[in-house]
């Protein structure tokens, strides 16, 4: 499936999204940004994303630091395409 996963710099490095992903799309990588963990989520295997959005649900930040954008084949099958 052709989903894209976007990680924003509001990520606090808590690893909740990584642990929630059933297909191991996400991993933590070193980051020199403004979080105490010194790590940020990354999505090196987006081709394995099934679009379940468990990562979004698991994210504890008010900013929703991770977003899954469903591919056109999924939105079409769900009746969400224009």
Swiss-Prot record:
InterPro entries: 4Fe4S_Fe-S-bd (IPR017896), 4Fe4S_Fe_S_CS (IPR017900), PSI_iron-sulfur_center (IPR050157), PSI_PsaC (IPR017491)
A GO biological process held by the record: photosynthetic electron transport in photosystem I
Cofactor note: Binds 2 [4Fe-4S] clusters. Cluster 2 is most probably the spectroscopically characterized electron acceptor FA and cluster 1 is most probably FB.
Keyword tags: 4Fe-4S, Electron transport, Iron, Iron-sulfur, Membrane, Metal-binding, Oxidoreductase, Photosynthesis, Photosystem I, Repeat, Thylakoid, Transport
One example GO MF annotation: electron transfer activity
Record-listed [4Fe-4S] cluster 2 binding positions: 21, 49, 52, 55
Binding site for [4Fe-4S] cluster 1: 11, 14, 17, 59
Needed cofactors: [4Fe-4S] cluster
Membrane topology of the entry: Peripheral membrane protein
Domain 4Fe-4S ferredoxin-type: 2-31, 40-69
Enzyme class: oxidoreductase
Disulfide bond annotation, renumbered to this chain: none
Catalysed reaction equations from the record: reduced [plastocyanin] + hnu + oxidized [2Fe-2S]-[ferredoxin] = oxidized [plastocyanin] + reduced [2Fe-2S]-[ferredoxin]
PROSITE patterns linked: 4FE4S_FER_1, 4FE4S_FER_2
Cited Pfam families: Fer4_7
EC number(s) recorded for this UniProt protein: 1.97.1.12
Localization terms from the record: Cellular thylakoid membrane
Any one cellular-component term (Gene Ontology): photosystem I
NCBIfam families named in the record: PS_I_psaC
HAMAP family in the record: PSI_PsaC
Biological role stated in the UniProt entry: Apoprotein for the two 4Fe-4S centers FA and FB of photosystem I (PSI); essential for photochemical activity. FB is the terminal electron acceptor of PSI, donating electrons to ferredoxin. The C-terminus interacts with PsaA/B/D and helps assemble the protein into the PSI complex. Required for binding of PsaD and PsaE to PSI. PSI is a plastocyanin/cytochrome c6-ferredoxin oxidoreductase, converting photonic excitation into a charge separation, which transfers an electron from the donor P700 chlorophyll pair to the spectroscopically characterized acceptors A0, A1, FX, FA and FB in turn.
Complex and partners: The cyanobacterial PSI reaction center is composed of one copy each of PsaA,B,C,D,E,F,I,J,K,L,M and X, and forms trimeric complexes.
Protein name from the UniProt record: Photosystem I iron-sulfur center
């Amino acid at each position: 499936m052709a989903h894209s996963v976007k990680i924003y710099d509001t990520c606090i490095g808590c690893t909740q999204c990584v642990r929630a992903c059933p297909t191991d799309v996400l991993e933590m990588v070193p980051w020199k940004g403004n979080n105490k963990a010194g790590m940020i989520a990354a999505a090196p295997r987006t081709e394995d994303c099934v679009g379940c959005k468990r990562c979004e649900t698991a994210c504890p930040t008010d900013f929703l630091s991770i977003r899954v954008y469903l591919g056109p084949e999924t939105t079409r099958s769900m009746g969400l395409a224009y």
